[in-house]
A protein has these predicted regions:
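Positively charged n-region of N-terminal signal peptides that target proteins for export
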Residues: 1-4
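C-terminal motif of bacterial Sec signal peptides marking the signal peptidase cleavage site
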Residues: 16-19
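Bacterial signal peptide processing site
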Residues: 21-23
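Bilobed "Venus flytrap"/periplasmic-binding protein-like clamshell domains
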Residues: 29, 34-59, 69, 92, ...
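Early extracytoplasmic/lumenal segment of secretory-pathway proteins
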Residues: 63-73
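Short helices/loops that flank or line small-molecule/ion binding pockets
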Residues: 73-87, 100-101, 134, 177-180
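Ligand-binding "clamshell"
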Residues: 97-110
């Protein structure tokens, strides 16, 4: 009888320990979330950043997911709320993030020429009679985003320098990204 009880107890012990030496398959892997602003087509942007995310994830030993926000502020709010761990953002968004979300800049990019600079562009149809910024007076304009330096702040300053009052001389709206 003792042998039978010992055998049953041994089987129960063995079966209760099965899987204890293995890592749990339900354990969640740590994921680092990278937020980016909508500077081009969202799917293309994620595809373009996939090699970077994979290389970074391999180096850190964790998965890196790329998140494209619907607006510039979306990345800042994501960092502030903790739903985004870090972001690749343009200069003005970085300044806003530092002020609004108590973040800090870890890396700062540099132009390929190595020289400081920034630019904004204004596009019109080829067959348009608009030849200068002053010709935009009375027109409808699409800016990128209120938090975009090149897509609103600098472009708006260029228009003001050309004698255009943004509130009186034009109608404008925000497209939501450089790709729109």
């Amino acid at each position: 009888m003792k042998k039978i009880l010992l055998t049953i107890f041994s089987f129960l012990l063995v079966f209760s320990l099965i899987g204890c030496s293995q890592k749990s398959s339900t354990k969640e892997e740590k994921v680092l979330k990278l937020g980016v602003v909508p500077s081009s087509n969202s799917e293309k942007l994620v595809d373009d950043l996939s090699p970077f995310a994979k290389a970074l994830g391999d180096k850190l030993g964790m998965k890196v997911e790329v998140f494209t926000a619907s607006s510039y502020i979306g990345v800042i709010e994501g960092i502030g709320s903790g739903s985004v761990d870090f972001g690749l953002v343009p200069p003005f968004s970085a300044v806003l993030s530092n002020k609004q979300s108590n973040t800090k800049n870890l890396l700062v990019g540099r132009s390929t020429s190595g020289k400081p600079g920034y630019f904004a562009e204004v596009f019109v149809r080829k067959d348009s009679n608009i030849k200068s910024l002053a010709d935009l007076k009375g027109k409808k304009i699409a800016f990128v985003d209120p938090s975009s330096a090149s897509g609103y702040i600098y472009a708006g300053a260029m228009l003001k320098d050309a004698g255009i009052d943004l509130d009186k001389d034009i109608q404008y709206q925000f497209s939501g990204g450089h790709d729109k």
